[in-house]
Structures are given as C-alpha cells and as structure tokens.
A protein has these predicted regions:
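Cell-envelope and extracellular/periplasmic
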Residues: 1-183
Length: 183
C-alpha cells in the first residue's frame, strides 16, 4: 500500500545508523480539526512519539527526527482557505512541540504533504492553496511532495489502490530528498 511504497523510497536514502519506524494514523473522511490537540488522533501521535523514543533508547539510538506524511484535505474541501491554513500551521506547531518534549529540544520535524485536488464551489481550491502557502512560508520544515491531480480516484474523493501506492512513493521520494539534504 501507500505506507509500504513511501517506506521503501525513504529506506533507500537511510544510512547504516538510521532506522525507520512507521505508524499509520489514518482517519478516513476526517477534517483537520480532528487531528489537533486535544483530540484523540493527536494524543495517539503523542503516544507514538514517546514509544519511538523508548524503542530508540532501547537500541542505543537517539530519536531525533519525525517525518509526517500528510495526506488529507478532501474532507475539508469546503473549509475556508485561511482557516485551513491556520489549522494546518497549528498542527505543524503542535507536532514540533510534542517532538521537542520527547527529544529534549533536539528533534527535527519534516511535514510532507501533497497538494490535494479538493475543490469547493466552481474551481475554488482553498485547501490546496493553503497547503502551498504553508510550504512556502516554512520551507525546509513543510514540503510539497507534488500535486495529486494526476492520481485516479474511484469516486472523485478516494484514490484507487494503484494511485494510493503512487502517492506513497511520491511522498517517500520527496522525504528522501529532504533527509539527504537535497532540498
């Protein structure tokens, strides 16, 4: 699936001292607000961060990097542009703060997203514009893997399986480039 294809692309760029732990916190048809604190999805992320730090420590490693592959936006197609941008920025800030807690301020957050095709009204793309603006404003921390317009959807919203795998690979390659210092 998409997580496997993303992981495969990321692993190609890891060094011998690096490890990759992947966690799927997918929530189908969920608006961005459900991922913000104090909601359960964010508490799950906090638990995963603590566990990742424990696993790394148990192996004599340091947990220092959180990479988020953010594939969301269709559920927020009607969310006003500025509101979505503000919520997305808040999510990035909250994730960075949660990471800082478990890494004693030594962590690095890379937030990778792909530009959704979500539209509202005729041709209005507030979510995709907000995603682009945040990536420009926070270059290096927030990265765009690319647009999603070329991926096939089964019902206009959900990706077909083959397209989901392609999206995972798109994210994985973008993340690998950033981790290698190419961006």
């Amino acid at each position: 699936g998409p997580l496997t294809s993303a992981s495969a692309a990321i692993i190609e760029g890891l060094g011998p001292q690096d490890r990759l732990l992947t966690v799927n916190l997918a929530r189908r048809n969920t608006r961005i607000a459900a991922f913000l604190p104090p909601e359960e999805a964010f508490r799950n992320v906090e638990r995963c961060l603590r566990r990742a730090a424990e696993i790394a420590s148990g192996q004599g490693l340091a947990f220092r990097r959180l990479v988020v592959s953010w594939v969301q936006g269709q559920a927020d197609a009607r969310t006003p542009h500025r509101l979505y941008r503000d919520q997305l920025g808040r999510l990035v800030d909250e994730l960075a703060a949660a990471l800082a807690l478990v890494t004693e301020g030594q962590g690095q957050l890379v937030f990778c997203l792909s530009q959704t095709t979500a539209t509202y009204y005729i041709g209005r793309r507030g979510v995709s514009l907000a995603q682009l603006e945040l990536a420009k404003a926070r270059a290096g921390q927030v990265i765009l893997a690319g647009p999603e317009y070329m991926l096939e959807r089964s019902d206009g919203v959900h990706l077909k399986p083959r397209s989901a795998v392609r999206l995972g690979a798109l994210h994985g390659r973008a993340i690998r480039r950033v981790l290698a210092g190419a961006e």
